[in-house]
Amino acid sequence: MKKQADSVRRANKTNSPQLQLITPFLWFDKEAEEAAKFYCSIFPKSKITQITRYGEAGPGPLGSVMTVEFVLNGLQFVALNAGPTYKFTEAISFVVNVRTQKELDYYWSKLSARGEKVACGWLKDKYGLSWQITPIVLMEMLAGRDANKTNRAMKAMMEMVKLDIKKLQAAYNGRS
């Protein structure tokens, strides 16, 4: 197993300083560039790194955007324009881990704009991609050893759409 991991590490050494082993690959109808710009406008340390276009042999119109490679806060993504064959589902989501209510409110507002607010901190953005805006403290509460506190936090979360850190903490501490 170690030999295989070392082999993968060697294979990933290219001119790219930080080639990641696993990259989320997102299938869009024809909104890949628009979506990448949208996501890059929301997250810090984000940018589009490369755009490729369809050539004569590709299934898309000649010269139209095929893929957009972009980075969101250090995580590399690829977005593909490939037609309406596949749609995003809630079976896959991206978790945004936040420390404060201000951060939670910011990401919730930006990502849910023209999208759908679902439940328990989940939302779908305007492209149908699912996100969870999750306070780090909630994960700590749910992993706690006191079953009563954990159950109170879970119950409070299940009744929320956008999460409220103060209300979650109050429930966890038995002050709701």
Task: Label each PLM-derived region with a short phrase.
Residues 59-60, 85-87:
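Short glycine/serine/proline-enriched coil/turn segments at secondary-structure junctions
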Residues 34, 89, 102:
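Residues that form or flank phosphate/diphosphate-binding pockets in enzymes
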